[in-house]
């Protein structure tokens, strides 16, 4: 294959230019003057998988407060789920799941998944763009950061990247995102700390040795130049391909390709993890959670747009976990969902919900402590359009927990990475 085709997108001096390697999309690492590597050793082979629910997921129809069902139903007369249809959770009679979440229910009841209730931050922002930026960078609501929380973690754990990498102890990309543009979560002090694979088709083009010709345009000239400063990124094409080609059989629980884009992304992640990549953090995403209208079907609220979105997540996570088990890689992986915000307590007249504050997140893996962290949100007896779910847990407590207790970031480094100290949660 033509290695020079590995780059499709690269950020250099703030400019994005197209590059070509079988459709791969990547932010290349420009030269910098970082301190040299100091013999850093990989603390463990654990992997964190982040699942972004883009648009603001409705937490109250995802995790239902059964103990307040009357208030829940009164606040949402046009979208409330029937109490006879919601999914029970072993040992937690006061809480249930949306009927579309059967795979996540099974993981929970098997002791391999948990819920953190009412996750948000002080003074929540209701803009999609700003709220997403807050979650990606790990900032306060009134502070702008130009680095991502995962980027700071990777920069702290792998000093000297990219100049001193790959190394014998870390020969692989530090982070991988399935998406055309690297997320701000992976932004380091000087450059992105990970690679972005544009889409599943691009991934399989690489694995199957499909090639493209360098275009005879001004972009081709820029390609030749950028290759010289992106040789380290180019090296990663080989290790990604080697890892992927070592896995020839995966779970049959995945939907057919194209039927569930999130499942397609997680299938790639499973293949790379099981193939031996030491990449620490993966990011995948699925969208359309901005359910202002027609969130549920009026004649059957267990169906409709939100149900389809949640089913997509549940089926993808279920297949992913089944795949990891079959590939003997499940013990290495912890996953979690997140969304930029939740929705209001009261549904609107359009059969939807408007931008809100706190919402639950799911976490899963063989090594997690299953259960529910926190209590059901307290619902008013007569909700108004302005009522929000109150925060119980700062989202940076979730980050601190997975960084310190799953990825083994020293407690002394949490302040540097998260710009503060946050209580740990019993997730691991």
Each predicted region: which residue ranges?
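Alpha-helical scaffolds flanking conserved acidic
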Residues: 47, 332-333
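Basic/polar, cationic surfaces and motifs that engage anionic cell-wall
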Residues: 343-350
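Feature for exported/extracytoplasmic and membrane-associated proteins, marking the mature portion
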Residues: 1-315, 319-327, 346, 360-428
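Acidic/histidine-rich, metal-coordinating catalytic segments
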Residues: 334-342
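C-terminal, helix-dominated tail/subdomain
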Residues: 350-361
